[in-house]
């Protein structure tokens, strides 16, 4: 089996770095899960954009007299959280839907729960933490209305990310439990090393895709019940 070339992130040619991951929703993710997986990717994009908008909000905060510490931390959050959120929770979700891996689902639930807590803290907006949340923004209206209005944009985005993260977590967890997933299955994958075996992963992916395209049970000898399989 030929190894698929990495294509993400799609870096310009003048940057002397190569993509680190292979990402192909159409060929990797079964039809049943593709929409959910794409929505998780869109949520990651929204979170990354929100961190960028927060950087602008913290710049306005600093110009309005709020100090430089928030702006400095906002730069750190963009540099740190954008790639880490992709690696720590989106990639496990992508691989979980791709190979129906309980271990990767558990990794996603653990890291994405942390992401949800972080999103709530960001939406709250504790002053001095480098985020334009509600406490920081509302409190700054008395100092600089113009800066506070700019800070309001990332505040709303942080709130949206927190709400959407909660919805996404509950939806994926409901699907996982409904499909028979459990912690014991994840522990079994960890013990056997199946979660990192490419041959096992490919077999699981083929099985998952086959299950999506053949919804009827398969038997060694299929009886004729007097109906046609033609649609």
Swiss-Prot record:
Family named by the database record: Belongs to the SCAMP family. SCAMP5 subfamily.
Protein name: Secretory carrier-associated membrane protein 5
Classification via Pfam families: SCAMP (PF04144)
Membrane topology: Multi-pass membrane protein
Cytoplasmic side: 1-39, 89-102, 170-231
Role description: Required for the calcium-dependent exocytosis of signal sequence-containing cytokines. Probably acts in cooperation with the SNARE machinery.
A Gene Ontology biological process term: positive regulation of cytokine production
Keyword Plastid included in the entry's annotation: no
UniProt main location, coarse: membrane
Phylogenetic placement of the source organism: Eukaryota, Metazoa, Chordata, Craniata, Vertebrata
Topological domains annotated Extracellular: 61-67, 126-148
Record's keyword annotation contains Metal-binding: no
GO CC annotation: Golgi membrane; plasma membrane; recycling endosome membrane; synaptic vesicle membrane
Species of the source: Xenopus tropicalis
InterPro entries: SCAMP
Residues that span the membrane, as ranges: 40-60, 68-88, 103-125, 149-169
Places the protein is found: Cell membrane; Golgi apparatus membrane; Golgi apparatus, trans-Golgi network membrane; Recycling endosome membrane
Keywords attached to this entry: Cell membrane, Cytoplasmic vesicle, Endosome, Exocytosis, Golgi apparatus, Membrane, Protein transport, Synapse, Transmembrane, Transmembrane helix, Transport
